[in-house]
Amino acid sequence: MLSDPIADMLTRIRNATRTHKETVDIPASKFKEELAKLLVREGYVQGVERTRPEGQKFDVLRVTLKYGEKREQVIKHIERVSRPGRRAYVSAENLPRVQRGLGVAVVSTSRGLLPDREARQQGVGGEVVCVLW
């Protein structure tokens, strides 16, 4: 049993990008699907689809990874911030600026999952799920 399924998702994406895989399959949940869709909107992955592989009981998210022209990684760094044992909540004023604004902090707010930029604009804080650049 996984104690932190979000950390598992981020690790699968990190490992797949380092080995230059085209896609990676992740056990599906609503939260992970929203996180993957946010990564698509922010331009870090190409696409995401929810499928059920033949002969399996549970849905998976098939994340299509994105690379640069020379197969360089688009995601250079991806890291879990708030963990089950140590939650990280911040107000809108204290939202982190990742790589001086070049990266993204994913924040779980009362308005859903938002990148730090949008959360700051809307004046909402929340739980910092992960950071990436």
Curated annotation (Swiss-Prot):
It comes from Deinococcus radiodurans (strain ATCC 13939 / DSM 20539 / JCM 16871 / CCUG 27074 / LMG 4051 / NBRC 15346 / NCIMB 9279 / VKM B-1422 / R1). This is Small ribosomal subunit protein uS8. Belongs to the universal ribosomal protein uS8 family. GO terms for biological process: translation. One of the primary rRNA binding proteins, it binds directly to 16S rRNA central domain where it helps coordinate assembly of the platform of the 30S subunit. Gene3D superfamilies: 3.30.1370.30, 3.30.1490.10. The keyword Ribosomal protein applies. GO terms for cellular component: cytosolic small ribosomal subunit. Keywords: Ribonucleoprotein, Ribosomal protein, RNA-binding, rRNA-binding. It comes from the Bacteria. Part of the 30S ribosomal subunit. Contacts proteins S5 and S12. One of its GO terms (molecular function) is rRNA binding. Coiled coil: none annotated.
